[in-house]
Amino acid sequence: MAPAAASLTAPNALAATSLPFLHGRKSGGGGVSVHAGAPSPSRAVAVVARRLWGSASSSRRMVVAAATAAEMAPAASGEEGKPFVEEMRAVAMRLHTKDQAKEGEKEPQAPPVARWEPSVDGYLRFLVDSKLVFETLETIVDRAAVPWYAEFRNTGLERSEQLKKDLEWFKEQGHTIPEPSAPGTTYASYLEELAEKDSQAFICHFYNVYFAHTAGGRMIGKKVSENILNKKELEFYKWEGNLSQLLQNVRNKLNEVASSWTREEKDHCLDETEKSFSYSGDLLRHIFT
């Protein structure tokens, strides 16, 4: 979504890669254009996640939210009838801090980037859990228990094969590849559950996981690569073809699918945003803990 500088706080960067959010569009010069989306007037986005995650949960949400502000494509004004993807971006903006986006409502809770101490072991845990999540999303749309899931097959955004190659590379370097951990298995199980019984909530996660990775996720990948991988660019951060067009194709499909939803169904999808932030934040924490 000349690029505006992202706030250099830990939540900013972490949010960037957060599998949910960070919905960027490339500008003509190759950068990411930055505009905050206006939220739908009906959204009171203090949203639904009623699980008692306490302060840790709040911290996870901040980690995920951060870089979205630097990567968000422009959203229309709050009038009814605008493309639904823009409503999804607008809701995500509300989970930012004020210094990240004018619509932000959260307090900053993470240390500055200078205090980051990423490790290869932690990054491997993140990659392994991310691979499981992407595999789960790909399996769900391939299986298409809900017929319109098939619209999201072979979008060009799929990441599991790229992650498989990256993990093979780490193995060749002598690193032990861990098994998926609780954050990854828990999120994958939740996605499977949603896919069967709550298609609107599922599509919220689908959208945020993929769009977050193409924007803020790359920011985090670059930072980690510079710190611990001697600037090696992983396959996880490479796409075939025109990424901007791949993203626009998915936006169009999402808007088309949502055009048949009731207002209640759309709101239910939007209400899942905070959970998406939280689950993705759990994965990101691997990198810095």
UniProtKB/Swiss-Prot annotation:
Known catalytic reactions: heme b + 3 reduced [NADPH--hemoprotein reductase] + 3 O2 = biliverdin IXalpha + CO + Fe(2+) + 3 oxidized [NADPH--hemoprotein reductase] + 3 H2O + H(+)
Keyword match Endoplasmic reticulum: no
Keywords: Chloroplast, Heme, Iron, Metal-binding, Oxidoreductase, Photosynthesis, Plastid, Transit peptide
GO CC list: chloroplast
Keyword Magnesium: no
GO biological process: heme oxidation; inflorescence development; photoperiodism; photoperiodism, flowering; photosynthesis
EC number of the protein: 1.14.14.18
InterPro entries xref list: Haem_Oase, Haem_Oase-like, Haem_Oase-like_multi-hlx, Haem_Oase_decyc_pln
Pfam families noted in UniProt: Heme_oxygenase (PF01126)
Reported function: Catalyzes the opening of the heme ring to form the open-chain tetrapyrrole biliverdin IX with the release of iron and carbon monoxide (CO). Is a key enzyme in the synthesis of the chromophore of the phytochrome family of plant photoreceptors. Essential for photoperiod response and repression of flowering through cytochromes that inhibit flowering by affecting both HD1 and EHD1 flowering pathways.
PANTHER family: HEME OXYGENASE 1, CHLOROPLASTIC-RELATED (PTHR35703:SF2)
Name the UniProt record assigns to this protein: Heme oxygenase 1, chloroplastic
